[in-house]
């Protein structure tokens, strides 16, 4: 995982070394960027599974990552509990990022350009349409993620009240907030008491 992190950081520094010029994303560019972004991010996202050897097949690792980022919820893992704590967290975290949209997440943390990113946001965001909540798309993305983070935190707290262990509560909340359903137990919520099931409902 350390190798993947270092590679990603190095590439990030390379691309951020040159300040981008002001430009506007039109719908065509937004759709193309979204498609390319999904491919690149999915490849990088599957590397922790593959390099760690916990999912030895690159194809299976890529499938699991794409399923996470797209919040599909399909899995190639016969035994979810065979993954390490770190990999299970990453698996659920891909769901959390994908629940709001991978590129919306990037818009929230990275200034992609000085121009307008509304069409990039429209191409990536879930739902029928995206309006400007605030004048700048980066601020809109941040606002959406603040709300998203708040709802996730509330779920974690409620699960803790239901006597779920902290690690389980965090991973489960990441998986359910993105509406994908990735979990860390083979028998899902049957491992916990009834109050946990009611919390998720």
Report the location of each language-model feature:
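Conserved small/polar residues in nucleotide/adenosyl-binding loops
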Residues: 199-200
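Alpha-helical transmembrane segments of integral membrane proteins
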Residues: 3, 28, 32, 36, ...
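Juxtamembrane inter-helical linkers in multi-pass membrane proteins
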Residues: 69, 115-137, 173-183
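Membrane-embedded alpha-helical bundles of multi-pass integral membrane proteins
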Residues: 86-87, 92, 138, 186-196
